[in-house]
Structures are given as structure tokens and as C-alpha cells.
């Protein structure tokens, strides 16, 4: 039985994340439409080359290098004295190149380097012969296009030449190019290292080069550095030579042909762990945190070797991993030397969470997959970056699942990749998978959710269509054919096609290329509409492009592989029954009885949504109420996600979607609850702070009551599976947010026991929920304990979690004091934060709930503090904070606070920014009275009324429990219920998030969404 929650003052803004860590071909679907078995065309038309294909966009080709010369080999030498924090470096590079068209100009890339000298020689006997000096060359730079032009004293006829250049530069401080990083040693000394991040266009910051992915060459690298430091690069060390009294030059073996963006080198005092040809480098005080990364790397490389049939050591003799303290991305797949941010490689069982371990494992799998997809075969141009990132995203879960069978890693793919991709790809502004770019900014923008998650989803769909054996054979053919070269999408299709010729895998006359072009050249994705004729058994299916927030007529046509199950034949695990929709609509003949449900897209392997007529939705809903496990868990998750987004787009009555979600009262598995978390978080964010919010909490309470009662939230068992841990975190977060006394008391007790020394440290796997909700009622001593724990920790993932937890406090004075530490003020000593951690403090406070938002507003109202805020954290951080405040503004009182803040900030907020902030906030206020808001409110009111009828009569005295303290009130007509695991409390909702990163390049979000503090009882 559900408890009736009557709530007045509630506050939380929830943030969903996943994570983490963004030339077009004018090709149509097919020349002549093939006949597809099992479906008759209802559209009356034929898919053509023009229908639905995204138009080619104009790009500035002046950013591309001329094709008059191409590189063959680079002989690169660099000298750095980073051991004493010297930021200048010097270098020389000898570039063997082929002139293919007579010219006197050799044009390459350069960003910020200063040339000292340059000369050109001919190589009449090829690259192995002695050079013949032609003379010194003139050079000029173009900072707009980042080109450097070397002009020869004579015309260079087609042939082989050597360009030798001396240069100098400065190590960057923005985690890009050749840059400086640092860490604090155990003795308190700050130690420096020099490292690289060249993808996508930053090799040109370290040496002049042909910095395009298709222009592959071999490299020999040598680096002069301190004797106390070690240099590593893509290839094994060949030899060393000591020079001067304290310097050494390390020489490396010659690389295979590779793209410039894959070159890497690190100069540091790091230590290593070794297993065969694999090594993991870490700062000395993190040495014991490298064990899992080494173990996982060995396992994952072995399964990829076997799966792809091309052993890694065919081309590369070693594979190193290194954790860099300052690293902008999640990781970088440099061939033979993979670089990571520390949180994506280091694992400490004493403090790291199950999510942290999963992030490490998936990131390693992602980067190891790149050793084939991106390194062995690189995209000819950034237009095809999905050939790298799509495969890496697929295999970060698939390879990990093969390496650790039975650990349930593959179960994460649907929620963290497919459903997340659809949420992003349903926007009108999305792009096709194939998409041209020219400028560095445009190229960087291609590393988005289309390149990663959508592409991984589409490739997973094709893997299921072709079958695993054909898939592996096709990939081996593709990789073998294009090894050490660039590739375009059509070459992948040819490789896959070669594996299925004559096998009848696809309909007669249909090719892999014809299918894939509709998915790679088309923006967005389809919704498959299913309408049943219950009298005849026939089913009409049709397709249209899906938009998240609207229903727009369109002519888009995809070749959609579909299958279906029904109640009497629920064979969800069979994938040899695909049929195809290649037109706008078709009729399917079935014998499914009218009283049985039908579900399309088994296990959601197809990258599309499915909508049904309302009666079929009703049949599905009723079936799940009777037996929640009668439909496969991944399809239950799909149904929840589809119903939610279909309702938001206007394709499905919102009440139908919400009625369907009521089956969650009985749901016991991770995947459906994670899908539901997305929908519930959206509704929570919209309704928080409104009069309708208490009805929403009644609804959520009804859904989670039973599952919460079955879970243990204050202890971790060795038998707990990965998915069980995800489920516990999701449900316990909602339960504590809903004010479940049991949840709040347990989290508070665990934190208090640890802080006072009367109990053990909280287990890492439940720490984020425990610390956050324990912090709601924490005293100053407990707040200070957690703050000191954060400051003393050297594990960056743990520090981030603790920062987020401190932001959960309900005490505005605590929060404002916490903010001052991010500015380095208020203590008289330097605060040991990294730059990104200072920004994280701000994020944690405004994400912690309405109390945190109000604390931030009050803080920024102080002119002296806002000046220091901008000086320390930058104007962009201020703007991000203002945007967060506006997005968390849901009522008139909160709007007044926002307006007062904008006024107080004066010229720091320009008129356009102020208008945008007010527009965002007003849209939140208007939503509740719009169509979607009214539909939701109506359903929730009816649900609450029905719930009230089944609720026991209230006693005169109501006990409201928040954490470990109890307040008793006696209103004239108080209402409570006492069934279930808790008595009535008031609260705000926080939801869990998925940390992606899987994709390894994907940027990172907050692990927990935090709630407000004030507890009130609605007085009758």
C-alpha cells in the first residue's frame, strides 16, 4: 500500500548525464528498389537517391593542405627540461616527403611554433640514399588556416625530398598539443611532466607536420630529458645516450605508418607495472592503483586479438597505458601509448566505486578497440570519424563482456548507449553520421554523440543483422584490406559485404552499402508506427523521422530491420528472423490473436523507436501488471523509454505512457528502472516547486515502495552483481529523496559512525548515496570530517564524489563557506584544489538542491565575492552558474530571486544573457500550464485521489522524520500513512546518473543529483 505524501517546501534540480566522454557523400538508398519478403508496399513510391538525404554543407576547403606533396617519414627530436618546470622546448624534424606535382612550396601545419632554420634536399636514390642539398628555404605562416609554407629556391619536380626544420615552442597549459601537467608528491612537492594530446588537430603544436588523418607516415622519435625522468613514446625504447651531466636522450624504434594525431610521448618520473608487452605508468603515489588496469588490459587485448583475427602484435610490439593528472578527455588511443585521465585508469578498492571500476574497464576496452579501428585503419578524413568512435563505443561494452563473461557489462549498452543516443539524436539540430568539417573547431565538434553513441548503436544493429560470424569475417576483411591506410565508409561496407556473399543473409538484391547509407547519410532516426487490425491479424507498419518535441511530416526513408514477438511466442533471444521496411509503409500478415500483445524490435537492437495503437499499449500494460517478467527486460526498458519520448513528441497520449509506467510497482531489474529514471527525472525537474509536485511524489512513492523494501541499502554483499549495485543506487536515491525514514536514518547513521570513529568507513559502492543523504542532516563536525577526507584524498574520483556529497548539505552557511574554499579564500592558506575541482564545487552546490541554489545566489549577491569568483573561476563559470540557476527556477518566488541576482550583477551580465536567463526561467513557469504540464497534472491528480481511497485513516499526531532527528507536530487535520518502510516525510527528489564515458572521449557529468533540505508538513 502506498503512503500519501503531503508536501509544501520542496527543492531539487536533477541533472541527467551519462559518462563520460563530440564531407558528406551524396548517396541514396539504392538505384532500384528490391522486393522485400514479408511486406507489401503501401507507400506507392520508391526510395530514391534524393529522398530524405541530408544536404551537403559548405565547408572552407582552404583549411585543407594542398595535394602537391605527401609525407613519407618524420625523424623528430625534442628537448624538454620539464623536470625544473621549464615551459620552453626545442626541436628538429626531418621530413622525408614525396612531391607529386611540381611546386616550389611545401605547405604543412603549424600552430604557435617559431622556426629557427629550414633547408631542403633532394633524395635522388630514395629515402635510403644520401641527401643532396638544394638550399635554405623561406617560410611564412598563416595563423588563420594554421599553415606554414616552406618556399624552395628552385621548383621541386615530382620525386623524393628531405625537409629539415629547427624550431622552438612552449608547452601548453590547456591540456592540448604538447603540454604540461603536474601532481603533488607525498612530501608536498609539486612535480611536473610533459605529455601530449594531438587528436584531432594539435600535433602541429609540437612540430610542423602534415596534420591530416589520411596523410600517414612513419616516425622515429628521440627526446632529450633529465636523467631523473623517463621518456616513453608509441614504440619501445631503442637506446639511450647520456649528454651533459644531467641530461639523457632516449631513442625509440620506428613506428608503422600512422596518422600524426596518434603520435604520443610523455616525459615524467612515473613508475610502471608490467605484464608481458603491456605496461601501466602512474605517478609514484598511485602505484598500487594500477593493478586492475593492467589486468583488464591484458584480458581485453586477448579477446580482441581472437575476435578480430588480427593479433595486435602483428603491427605493434608493445602497449602502454599512462594516467595523466591533467587530461581534458577521458582517454586517447595513441597507438602503443594510451593516455588517460586518472579517473579513467586508476582503481583503488578501498575508495573506488563499482561505477568507477566500470568506467575504468569500459574506457580501456574503448581505447583498445581503437588500436584496430582508428590506428591500424584511420579515417581518410574527419567526415568519417564514426569509423573510429562508433566501433570503439560498441566494443567498449562488447569486448569487455567477452573479457569478463558473466559480469553483465553488455547489459549496460542499451541504456548507456542506444537510449542515450536517441535522446540526443532526436533533436532537430542533429547531424548525419557522415558530415564534413574543415576548421579545427568544426572538426572538434564532430566528436559528439552521433560519432560515438549513435554510430555504435547502428553498428550493433548491423552486427545482429549479419550475425556474429559474418560480422567478424567482414571486419577482418576490412581491416586487412585497409591496414596502415586511410578508409572511407564504403570500404567498410565492402568488407562486410564480402563476408555474406551467397549466404542469403539479406534480401535478394540488397547490399550492406544500400542499407548503411540510409543510416549514415540521414540525420536522426525513425519511429516505426505499428497499427494492428484486430479482426484480420494484419499489422500496418510505417516509418517517419522522430523528433523529441514535435511531430513533423517528412519524407525520410530508412531501411529498417524489424522483428517481433507476441504473447504466445515470446522468443526474445532469436535474431534470425529480420524482415525489412524499405518504404514509407507496409502491411504484414500475422496470426497473432486479438487478445495477445505484440512487441517489435527484440531487445532493442534496432536503432529506432516503436509506437503502437493504444489497444496494444493497453495489452502490454496489462500483461506486465500480471507478470512483470513476461517481456524481456531490455524490451521493458525500451517500452518505458519509447513511451516517455513518444508522449513528449506528441505521438502518444501522455496518460497512456504514465499508465504503462505504473507496472513499475512490480519491476525488479536494472534496465527498466534506469529507463524510468530518465522520465521521472524530467517530470521531477518540471514540477519541483509547483503546487502539483506533491502528487508527483505520491506517484513515485507508489512505484518504488515494494522494490525498496527488498533491497539492502546500508551494506554491500560480495554476491551483489554489477546490475544489482546500479539498481540499489537508483532506488535508494529516490527513496531518500522521497523522505523514506528508513533510508534517511540509515545514511545518516553510517556517515555519523564513520565521522565519529565509532564505525567503519562507508563501503565505496554505497558511499555517494550515503554521504549525500547523510549530509542532509549533518552537523558541522560531520561536514568538516567529509571536507577533510576530500582534501586528504589523492584519488581524483573519490575527491569528485566527496565534493558532490558536500554540495548536498542543507545548511546554507556550510555551503557558502564551501564556496569560499573554491576561491582559495577565507582560510589564509592555499586550498589544495585542481582547477576543475574548483568549478566542481560550484556545480555540486547548485546541483545539490534548492538550498544550494539559494546559497549560490546569496553568495553572488556580494560584490566582493563575485569579483573574486570571476577572478578565480572565470566569467564562463559565472555564466554557467547563472544558466544553472535559471534552469532550476520553477516558481514566482524563485524568479524574483533570479531577477534580483541579475540586477545585482549589473554589467557582468549583458542584456542578451539576461534575456536568455529570464526566457529559460519563464519557460519553466509556463510549462506547468501548457498542454504537457496539464496532461501530467491531471493524471497525477487522479492517481493521488485513487491512492487516497486506499490509504489508511490518519492519526491525529504525525511524525515527520528527516535523518536522525524527529519532530512531532499536531495539526488540526494532519494526514499520514504508516504502511511500507517509512512514515511520511517531505523532501525533494534526486536521481542517479550514468557516468559514460565510455566513450572514452566523451565529457563527464555529476554522479548524483542532490536535494533540498527544508521539511514541512502541509497543514489542513
Curated annotation (Swiss-Prot):
Residues 998-1020 form a propeptide. It is an enzyme of class 3 (hydrolase). Zn(2+) binds at residues 366, 370, 389. It catalyses: Release of an N-terminal amino acid, Xaa-|-Yaa- from a peptide, amide or arylamide. Xaa is preferably Ala, but may be most amino acids including Pro (slow action). When a terminal hydrophobic residue is followed by a prolyl residue, the two may be released as an intact Xaa-Pro dipeptide. Its cofactor is Zn(2+). GO terms for cellular component: cytoplasm; extracellular space; membrane; plasma membrane; side of membrane. Binds 1 zinc ion per subunit. Residues 958-981 are annotated as: Disordered. A lipid is attached at residue 997 (GPI-anchor amidated aspartate). InterPro entries: Aminopeptidase_N-like_N, Aminopeptidase_N-like_N_sf, ERAP1-like_C_dom, M1_APN-typ, Peptidase_M1, Peptidase_M1_aminopeptidases, Peptidase_M1_dom, Peptidase_M4/M1_CTD_sf. The active site is at 367. Belongs to the peptidase M1 family. This is Aminopeptidase N. Its EC number is 3.4.11.2. The gene is APN1. It is found in: Cell membrane. Pfam families: ERAP1_C (PF11838), Peptidase_M1 (PF01433), Peptidase_M1_N (PF17900). Substrate binds at residues 199, 330-331, 333, 366, 389.
